[in-house]
Amino acid sequence: MTNFTDIRDFLRAHCARYPELALQDVFKALYQSAFGCEHLIAGPSAAADYIRAEAARSGDRISKLVELLGGDYCRVHLGILQDGLSAETFARLFALSARHEECGREKLEAMLTALQTMADAGELPFSAQETAEAVERWRKDGFPPLHHSEIFRQNYAPAYRVLRRDFARALPLFARIDRLTAERSRVLVAIEGGSASGKTTLGELLQNVYGCPVFHMDDFFLRPEQRTEARFTQPGGNVDRERFLEEVLIHLREGRPVDYRRFDCATFTIAPPQRIEAGTLNIVEGAYSMHPDLAPYYDLSVFLPISAEKQRERILKRNAPAHAKQFFDRWIPFEQRYFDALDVRNRCDLILSADD
């Protein structure tokens, strides 16, 4: 967030939300917008214990607010635990959000310039001189992380962690998974959606948080003998769902190991098996994962919609022109016909937007 208009809008909204804030609270929000998490990360168990204890101390003042900061981050208030998210999952997301921001100082300086411009124009509850002097002191100290002011703590009882925005979008899914895994010995989750909607990225995040196996529908393209005109006329016919059901889903549902055989698109053959143990949590990601033949085997499903404009932008960015053309002319129309004919989006339990 280095665009002046965006910074001004953020600062105005922040001061309006917290009318009793001090200048150091504004600095803290700008620091978090530029650098993200400023806390030292304890081990997973200790971090979860801290979260539980802080939530308990907050009592009835706790909030479920997900508060957007500038840039890639947001504040997620600890009341989110009341929706079923476990402290352990929250702690892992917090740790994964802590990363070194190489351009953090540059971003912070741009935001401070905008802050001073607004103070000079009388748009903030701080004088121009007060702002300039405080910024200079902070700069001379090397921009260390700051605590909230005492007046802020008294008025607003802040209890939150800074997470990446893309992680926070998936919090409803994490909460549902945590509730299910607390109740059941085995949970299967499907991530459905169109090309470039973020299915693989979400699957990787779930794997990083839970250490669970992830299975990809893209490993089950049709074998040469299946690629018939009749097959391609079927909504959802563009995947070897029969092999996926027999070799993967049934095994996972029964808690048996999977001898996972990927389809090799270079040779049009099936690779030798790789043994994968069924987990407590098992993720299936990819278009066609919620085909009616497969859907009954899942405990939870999520659909990732994406606008045509964003989809096109992402596909062009990650593919050579000839390959991108295949998506636009062939694969996306196949997917859209499947989504429409089988009402896939509405049959999923959750919908999480992939658009920014």
What is the predicted role of each segment?
Residues 199:
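Conserved lysine of the Walker
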Residues 1-153:
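Long, basic/Gly/Ser/Thr-rich N-terminal segments
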Residues 155-182:
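N-terminal pre-Walker A segment at the start of P-loop NTPase domains
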Residues 210-216, 220-276, 281-284:
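Conserved nucleotide-sensing/catalytic segment adjacent to the nucleotide-binding pocket
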Residues 202-203, 207:
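Post-Walker A alpha-helix
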Residues 188-190:
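Short hydrophobic/aromatic beta-strand immediately N-terminal to the Walker A/P-loop
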Residues 194:
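P-loop (Walker A) phosphate-binding loop of NTP-binding proteins
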Residues 270-318:
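ATP-dependent NMP and nucleoside kinases share a basic, alpha-helical "lid"
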